[in-house]
């Protein structure tokens, strides 16, 4: 079905709005120049996590650190293969982490609301916007325990900390034990640096530190937001425990390891889904009779979602041409629309 749709699309005349006028001296040459080789190639989905490893992580289901290591080993292999949609994977996990953080802070903002917020005009303000920025910064930059980075995250949570002193403590923790245990200790250090009255905000800071230290220890080029996506899972809590473990609690190391075991499995599932979707997008891209199409493909592979207006800013095309291009991709099953609205639509893998 997709091949037939592609052949049909290839026979359609190009949309005049999709064209970018070329200088007179280059127009004739442009007609005869060979097509460029696609920048991205299709990529096999990562190996699925075994059923025995997927069952781990829950309270009372064996050693959570063992299951965390198994999941991280597979996720590490998947990331080191450098899949085309690695950016979209990190961006989507950052969105999930922001939504989970909003629940911890009792902020009314789910994934859909956060997606809309990310495309709001101007500089969005408020707790939800700050949470989204914290996790996007975490996933979008090389992992670092630089005091300035720590201070910026703390400021967005309205926390008064000593960034230099905290950075020194975190670096000391980061070199200890195995990667997951080191990240758990660093999270405890970050959490303990804040007065008890701001425990919820301190936990968000601690979770971002956890993922940063984990990335440093695993030598990932960018952190992959993991722990917040599963920390609220009720199966991590032992029966009769009363409340969810927080950094510094005796049950925290096991809860953190269990959350990572579950998060790594879910991240691998998401990576496999994005690999299949990105392969469809990459296969469709050469058939699109639009010069800026490759830039749109790049945006979709690097982000959770893209608006036509944003696409038009990054590619030499009008907003109407961008909407038409996304409609074509949607028709061919190469992208999805996330908002469900007739206007102000958002597209992604």
Feature-to-residue mapping (PLM):
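Loop-centered beta-sheet repeat module
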Residues: 163-226
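Long, low-complexity, charged/polar intrinsically disordered regions in eukaryotic proteins
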Residues: 215-284
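Short acidic, hydrophobic short linear motifs in intrinsically disordered regions
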Residues: 296-297, 302-314
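Short hinge/loop at the helix->beta-strand junction immediately C-terminal to the helix-turn-helix recognition helix
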Residues: 305, 331-334
